[in-house]
Each structure stands twice: as structure tokens, then as C-alpha cells.
Amino acid sequence: MKKGLWLGLILIGFWGCEKTPNTAVFLGGQVVKPSSSFVSVYFGNRVLDTFLLKNSTRFSRKYDSLPPGIYKMEHIPEFTSILLEPADSIWVRINAAAFHESLVFSGRGASKNNFLTDIRLRLELENNFLASQYATSPEEFKQTVDSLLKEKKQQWIQMDSLNKLTPYAQKITQAAYVYAYAGIQERYAMLRGNQWDSLQNKRFSGYRKFLNYGENDLAFFDPYITYLMNYLTREALLPGENYLTARQDTDFNLRRLQVIQNKITGIRVRNNLARAVAYEELLNFGNHNNHEKFLEYYFDINTSPSYLEEIVALHQDINQMDAGKKLPEIILQNAELKLLSSNQMWEKPTVLYFWSQTQMNHFKSTIERIKSLEAQHPNYRFVGVSIQPLNPIALEVYKMMELDPKNQYGLVDFGTASKKWVITLLNKTIIINKKGQIQNGFANLMSEDFEE
């Protein structure tokens, strides 16, 4: 009798455990050769966690529960997507000097993330090849893309059979290549199809009927958003209109907002796409006089208070970079690793250029350009600004490149500085007079008309 009682209690205990599945999520990792002092994790547009790397290159956190979804892990200036589900226990290793190429996941839930990383790298390797195929006919191009799509599908089938993914993970991992190749086809049509008739458009775009235009689960997934941006761009083009010319016009971006309003169903997706279009329009500084008109329409479409605040702030920051205004003050770090105000720098007309410690090839080409400009414009001071804080490695780079450390600085808070100075591209250059007033807040160092 007692044995039966104990057996019953044990079975009840087991059943009780089964009714309470593990929902905890562990996320940790190590950053080799860090390019900044922290790692941030985002869910949607919200910061979930920030890990400081001051005393260690490792970080970790156990969460009692997290909603399944696509999270973003950022180590400035790079980021990657991570697919997390209940009971995942993931460790990620990163070498910041080769961020995407070095990404390796291990632990429970690693396989789906390694698959996403592998797909991304394979697609990047295919970019040059596919660009070379833009001269082929629509039929030939579709055949090429279909062949690559079939190859990725076979890889996915093998990965799924070995790991028994959840339906949610299956959807995300399949979307990584399905929407990527759909986006490539949209771009081909965008660049080559401006003379197609309606029948040619319909034949080429047959893949669209298999796709979803309101998938909120993918609202923060790059392949999906990239596809939709190409889709709405193509839909916004007028018959015979050239994309490379049209994209410079505010009216074109207004038409893209109309496509979002009429064709995109998911609220989160709509808001993300409208935000992306708003960024492209506002950062097209040649359209500055038309931005108020654009924003009026954007305000009607957007339903996200945080995005509204963000876009308005960007517009205001851009206004503060108008010619004749004083350059907004930020805190910089000099080559002695001491902090100072940017207001202390203006002794003579100055050209500010930017570089990243993780993109040394870009830095080398930048320095070649700067040395040429220095020889031609001795009345200007040319100041380099690393978008990451300076460190001993950066100081060694200055010596190797034979740069005057007195003209080299680093940002100590990229988030604040990039907003105040509207730093969105490494080729961005700011030209200042000796009073610290802006002459050109949005010059491009590599453009042919830079010296004008």
C-alpha cells in the first residue's frame, strides 16, 4: 500500500514538472577585440539590456521569460539579429574586427542562429555575381535566382530535419532566404523594368503571390523589410520613370508612403517602413525645403509615438546643422585619452572627417584623400574623428599612418554625438569656419564636387 502511495506521489511530481515547461532564456557571449565598451540587446525598437565590457569581454543574462522573436544584438558600429524562443540557452562569440564573419553560436537554439548567419554571409558573397547578371534577360535572371533559392531551400530542409525547429523558427529561418531573393528580383525589376508593359511586369512578379505583406512577426527582420522597401519603391515608380533619378525627389517618397498606406496591412510593418522612408527623405539634404510637406503626410500614416518623436528629433537635429549655425557641442577624447569639448577645437577653418576602427580599408582610403586635400588647402585643419573611443591600438594606427595625433579624436558617446552631428555615413564630412560656425554640415568626402 505504501509503495503504491509513493509511486503515485512520484508520478504526480513528474506530471507536475511536465505541466510547467521551462521558459527561461539564457543569452551570453564573448567579444574579442571589442570596438566599443558595451553590447546592447534590442527587442523591436526597445532596448532590452545593455552589457558593459569594462572589466571583461564576456557578458551574460538569464531571463525568466522572453517572448519568442527576432532580437538585435548591437556592438557599435555593427549588429546582428538573434532568434530567441523560450528555453533557449545561447552563447555567441564575436571578433569585432571581423564581426559577421566571426559570429558563432553554441548551446540550445544555436543551430537556427548559425543558419541565419550562414545564409547572410552566403548572400553577401553572391552580391557581386548577381549584380553581374543584371544585364541578362528577365527570364535568365529569374532562372539564376530560382537556382540559388532551390540551393538554400535544400540547406534549410537538412538543417530543419536535424534540429526539429518549432513552427515559429521554421517561418523565420525560411524567410531569411525567401524574402532575400524576392528582394533581389524586385531590385532587378526596379532597375531594368521601367520600360516593361503590364504583362511583362505580371509575368516577372509571379513570386509575389506567395508572399505576405503584413507579417508583424517579421517587422524587425532585415530580409523582410529590405524586400518590402524594394517592393514599395517599384510600386511607386511611374511608367517609364528611372529609379536612380526618381529617388532624389520628395514626390517619389510621398508616393512610397501612399503604397504603404494602400498595400501594407500589418501595423508594425507599416510603421517600420514609413520610418525607413522618412529617414531616407530627411537624410536627402538636397530636399530640405520640402521636408515639412513630407512630414505632414508621414504624421498621418505613422501610429507609433516613439517613431514620431524620433523622426521629429531627426528633423530638428538636421535643422541645427544648417550653414551659418554654430556646430552643436559634443564631448570628444583626444590622443592623450583626455576629454574635451568640441567647442575648444576651432582655431582655424576645419574639416571634420570620420572613421571606424572596424573598417580599416575605408580608413586607409580616407587618409589618402585627406593627405591630398591637406596639400591643396593648407589654410584648413583636417581633423579625424573615430566613431569609437580611442585605445592603444588606435594610437598605434596613427603612428603607422604617420598622422599628427593632435588632429585625431574619438567619440566617447556615439549615440549622442551621432544625433547631434547627424553622423549616418563614414564619408560624411563637416566643414567649420574658425568661429565654429557650420559652412557645410553634410559634405561627402568622396564626392567629386567636395572641394566646391
Residue map of PLM features:
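Bacterial Sec-dependent N-terminal signal peptides
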Residues: 1-26, 441, 451-452
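A non-transmembrane, solvent-exposed segment enriched in polar/low-complexity residues
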Residues: 17-169
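Oxidative protein folding and maturation machinery
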Residues: 96-340
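Short active-site neighborhood of thiol/selenol oxidoreductases, capturing the structured segment around
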Residues: 339-370
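Structural microenvironment flanking redox-active thiols in thiol-disulfide oxidoreductases
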Residues: 361-401, 413-417
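Non-catalytic, surface beta->alpha helical segment in thiol-disulfide oxidoreductase systems
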Residues: 425-428, 434-452
